[in-house]
Swiss-Prot record:
Signal peptide: none
Species assigned in the record: Mycoplasmopsis synoviae (strain 53)
GO BP: any one term: translation
Recorded GO MF terms: rRNA binding; structural constituent of ribosome; tRNA binding
Family statement drawn from the similarity comment of this UniProt entry: Belongs to the universal ribosomal protein uL16 family.
GO cellular component, one term: cytosolic large ribosomal subunit
Name this protein carries in UniProt: Large ribosomal subunit protein uL16
């Protein structure tokens, strides 16, 4: 699963996912096809990993899956049955905010039909609505 090696702060303040459109990372850069978010949400490292596995299993040994997002923020939680107070809980999960129009995954090295099918399978594992886009200038 994806998580940072080191962070400046172990427990960040709670932030809301930004509902504005992304102006960086909103085009297909490395592959031929991409999975672009239509809504915004927090995406967990486990969701990213399950989407990656779904896409790579669909492709087999051909092609590459490129992950364009990384979970930098930790989500803290306290154990079940612990009363309120006595500090903040320990980090449990890692999240990343995904803005509207952010390209989440890219695929290269396969035909358009196989790339679209792999991205469709990966998109169903994510908590955002999505669409499949092609690289500009590639048919």
């Amino acid at each position: 699963m994806l998580q940072p090696k080191r962070t400046k702060y172990r427990k960040p303040f709670l932030q809301s996912h930004d509902k504005r459109k992304a102006h960086k990372g909103n085009k297909v850069s490395f592959g031929s096809h991409g999975l672009q978010a239509v809504t915004s949400a927090w995406v967990d490292s486990r969701q990213i990993e399950s989407a990656r596995i779904a896409a790579t299993r669909s492709l087999g040994r051909e092609g590459n899956v490129i992950i364009r997002i990384f979970p930098h923020f930790s989500k803290t939680s306290k154990p079940i049955g612990v009363r309120m107070g006595s500090g903040k809980g320990s980090p449990e999960k890692w999240y990343t905010p995904v803005k509207v129009n952010t390209v989440v995954f890219e695929i290269q090295g396969v035909s358009a039909e196989r790339a679209k099918e792999a991205l469709r399978l990966a998109g169903h594992k994510l908590p955002v609505k999505w669409k499949i886009i092609e690289k500009e200038g590639v048919n």
